[in-house]
Amino acid sequence: MLPCSLFLPKHISTSLVFLRSARHGFALLPRWVPRLSSDYPPAAPIRLLAAAASSRRPADGAGAPSRVRQNFHPDSEAAINRQINLELYASYVYLSMAYYFSRDDVALHNFARYFLRLSREEAEHAEKLMRLQNQRGGLICLQDIKKPDQNDWKSGLNAMECALLLEKNVNQSLLELHTLASDKGDPHLCDFLETHYLNEQVKSIKELGDHVNNLVKMGAPESGLAEYLFDKHTLGNENNHN
């Protein structure tokens, strides 16, 4: 039979007590007493888990090397993260425009719907790039999103002109990303940009350019009636089709 001391927990000790017996007199029996040793209590479980995890984590905190990464240059990975930030910034600007035009003292609700649609499209563009980053084995590094340059968009014409400039900036960034991908010999990234972004950007620039031109012809921004009619008929029809 194994001695009971083998089954004692590390931090529990025993003491002896006297038990009086009518037949046998006094006897020594072990009594279980939770008398704790000097190294009790042990480290908290959460701290132990964190220490174990940190011992396995690389120094840069980036996680284990990707098993799916192939022909994906670090410069392309960084440029995609910058493009994600730009797409989110564009979405932020269009969201500001949308809720400016839905104010009670502006009340151009088709302008509001138009820019809200653009905001959602830009957010989808950012998410699509995030999915690409994961598919290629890159690391998504989100950055601070810059606030819009203005909160008062003044007129429909001013907002359309700002949107046109913004779309050109986004397009230029995409073109530079495409050039980088080509220089690094990454046909998949080139095809991805051509399929999902470049053609759509050209269409958006043309659409916004047409809107600016038509508003100017109608007498905006001096004529408030021009923006009202443009909101009601031109953008109203577009929103119905979309």
From Swiss-Prot:
Check the record and name the Pfam families matching this protein.
Answer: Ferritin (PF00210)
> Record-annotated residues binding Fe cation 1?
87, 122, 125
Q: Which GO terms describe its molecular function?
A: ferric iron binding; ferrous iron binding; ferroxidase activity; iron ion binding
Transit peptide region: 1-49
Instruction: Tell me the ranges covered by the Ferritin-like diiron domain, including all copies.
Output: 70-219
Q: Specify the enzyme's EC class, one word.
A: oxidoreductase
TM ranges: none
Instruction: Give EC number(s), comma-separated.
Output: 1.16.3.1
Query: Which reaction(s) does the protein catalyse, per the Swiss-Prot or TrEMBL entry?
Result: 4 Fe(2+) + O2 + 4 H(+) = 4 Fe(3+) + 2 H2O
Specify whether Ribosomal protein is a keyword of the entry.
no
In the record, biological process GO terms are: intracellular iron ion homeostasis; iron ion transport
Where, by residue number, does Fe cation 2 bind? 122, 167, 201
Gene Ontology cellular-component terms for this entry are: cytoplasm; mitochondrion
Identify the keywords attached in UniProt to this record, alphabetized: Iron, Iron storage, Metal-binding, Mitochondrion, Oxidoreductase, Transit peptide
Where does this chain mainly localize? Answer: mitochondrion
Its subcellular locations are:
Mitochondrion
PANTHER family found in the cross-reference section: FERRITIN (PTHR11431), FERRITIN, MITOCHONDRIAL (PTHR11431:SF30)
* Assembly and binders: Homooligomer of 24 subunits. The functional molecule is roughly spherical and contains a central cavity into which the polymeric mineral iron core is deposited.
Q: What function is annotated for this protein?
A: Catalyzes the oxidation of ferrous iron(II) to ferric iron(III) and stores iron in a soluble, non-toxic, readily available form. Important for iron homeostasis. Iron is taken up in the ferrous form and deposited as ferric hydroxides after oxidation.
Task: Give the family this protein belongs to, as stated in its UniProt record.
Answer: Belongs to the ferritin family.
Designated name of the protein: Ferritin, mitochondrial
